[in-house]
Amino acid sequence: LLDRVYANGFARLPVGRARYGVMLRDDGIVFDDGTTTRLGEHRFFMTTSTAKAADVLSRLEFLLDSVWPDLRVAVTSVTDEWAAMSIAGPHSREILSKALEGLDLSDAALPHMGLLEGDFDGRALRILRLSYSGELAYEVYVGASGGEAAWRRLLEAGEAHGLKPYGVEALGALRVEKGHVAGPEIDGRTTLDDLGLARMAAKRSGYVGAVLGRRPALTRPDRQRLVGLMPVDAGERLSGGAVLFGPGEVHRGHGRGRVTSVTYSPTLGTYVGLGLLAGGAGMEGTEVVAVHTMKGEAVRARVVSPVFLDPEG
């Protein structure tokens, strides 16, 4: 099932390891992304984007009922069974080790994209070493009734390091700095290639969207593809939804692309953004004008790599 619904393969994923995967619609457009962890030979733990959780489950149920009824596979939502939280940052391993004593969180025991299962006050515990923020990070899953206790224990263990809760806006800022795509980029119009993820696609053709994804309209070299954007004047702010034009072009129509996500980067001391621009990476080093008609804005921006920080990490 996983090899059919994800564009990348999962058959060779070892037990105890996770993999990032991307699902396509029948027409080859990106549907959703997330990670799936192999718990056992025939058991997997799948996560999706928040917005598409119900849609993904519905999609899997439809495919199993109507398209592949011969597959002996069952899918079940376990969202209500787990309390989930993420801890990220340079001290995350130290804090987690203090909060959950007795667990080996070393690189050897829990490598990147690895799984560790254990017990938390008599409740099931799963720790995944995954990072959406670009920092050393862990996803902690505890049996639902133990969620508050686990949360408090993490806060207590992290007090000496200044651990603070962070919400979706902070997480959004971190993911933009790392060039990670989310809902604004996976908007029902983009392909794997548009998002810089084409290398993930398996060479086989047995997954949903593989055939129609090769249509000429979806493989044109002038399609809008993911880029990074930085204001030429560091004091100016980009706006999400702004239309991108070339310097000197009349600010009318659909332009050359659009700004999809924007955040202020404390590290870089300026606003940065992700966008979809005709020519994609080939436009890096050039300038565009981000025009937001309703706000009366026309901001000059440099086209750069979508990975603003630590491209090797």
Q: Model-derived features: where do they sit?
A:
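Conserved, structured C-terminal
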Residues: 39-313
